[in-house]
UniProtKB/Swiss-Prot annotation:
<dbReference type="Pfam" id="PF11566">
    <property type="entry name" value="PI31_Prot_N"/>
</dbReference>
<feature type="modified residue" description="Omega-N-methylarginine">
    <location>
        <position position="205"/>
    </location>
</feature>
<dbReference type="GO" id="GO:1901799">
    <property type="term" value="P:negative regulation of proteasomal protein catabolic process"/>
</dbReference>
<dbReference type="GO" id="GO:0043161">
    <property type="term" value="P:proteasome-mediated ubiquitin-dependent protein catabolic process"/>
</dbReference>
<feature type="region of interest" description="Important for homodimerization and interaction with FBXO7">
    <location>
        <begin position="2"/>
        <end position="150"/>
    </location>
</feature>
<keyword id="KW-0597">Phosphoprotein</keyword>
<dbReference type="GO" id="GO:0070628">
    <property type="term" value="F:proteasome binding"/>
</dbReference>
<keyword id="KW-0647">Proteasome</keyword>
<comment type="subunit">
    <text>Monomer and homodimer. Interacts with FBXO7.</text>
</comment>
<protein>
    <recommendedName>
        <fullName>Proteasome inhibitor PI31 subunit</fullName>
    </recommendedName>
</protein>
<keyword id="KW-0256">Endoplasmic reticulum</keyword>
<feature type="compositionally biased region" description="Pro residues">
    <location>
        <begin position="251"/>
        <end position="265"/>
    </location>
</feature>
<keyword id="KW-0963">Cytoplasm</keyword>
<dbReference type="GO" id="GO:0005829">
    <property type="term" value="C:cytosol"/>
</dbReference>
<dbReference type="InterPro" id="IPR021625">
    <property type="entry name" value="PI31_Prot_N"/>
</dbReference>
<dbReference type="Pfam" id="PF08577">
    <property type="entry name" value="PI31_Prot_C"/>
</dbReference>
<feature type="region of interest" description="Disordered">
    <location>
        <begin position="222"/>
        <end position="271"/>
    </location>
</feature>
Amino acid sequence: MAGLEVLFASAAPAITCTQDALVCFLHWEVVTHGYYALGVGDQPGPNDKKSELLPAGWNNNKDLYVLRYEYKDGSRKLLVKAITVESSMILNVLEYGSQQVADLTLNLDDYIDAEHLGDFHRTYKNSEELRSRIVSGIITPIHEQWEKANVSSPHREFPPATAREVDPLRIPPHHPHTSRQPPWCDPLGPFAVGGEDLDPFGHRRGGMIVDPLRSGFPRALIDPSSGLPNRLPPGAVPPGARFDPFGPIGTSPPGPNPDHLPPPGYDDMYL
């Protein structure tokens, strides 16, 4: 137990009861696990400083000890309280960041010899058992809960573009005139069906209306001026607009037959 004897020697003049000796042992165990003492009390004070020694005034109240600690890398802070209840001491530890709590109850007579508080070699009884109980009852639970809270804490992540609903009023991506348009279309999310029907710019994607002329298969270009004596001026038909030519479309594949469905009641012989 390297360091405990040195700590005990520095605090020996202030150790006047069994609970003082137990808090001294608890402090040493916390420090050996990478913590520094900051000060006493629930709230930070102007005299706080990192130290491996017990802070000034650590045992002013023999019934309630309140110490604050900070991990060596500053990642976590502990609030340690030791409450004396008759011949027992209740140890309570709070980790500020995760708000995790651990507690342990110890019988003072099992680990402290009240008759030899001035002799380090005789003050502590069953020191290995005492150390094991502090580690398993306080240190390990706090560390495990802190690590678990950090691993399982939710991180806000936006879903990928393919899983988000497409905003029909968004501004289309800008492509300089000197560069070519990319040959691919933006992927649509599963909940964006029909969104293109609301897009006034009429991009290359389809909506909910079936358009055989835009089914994705190769087809001949349609001249919107077909059947007119003169050609339509440039820009008369917006790009991507659903436009029916004024006249026959020549050798292009014919459109859907308007009579491909039977009229209502065609099979009623009495109609």
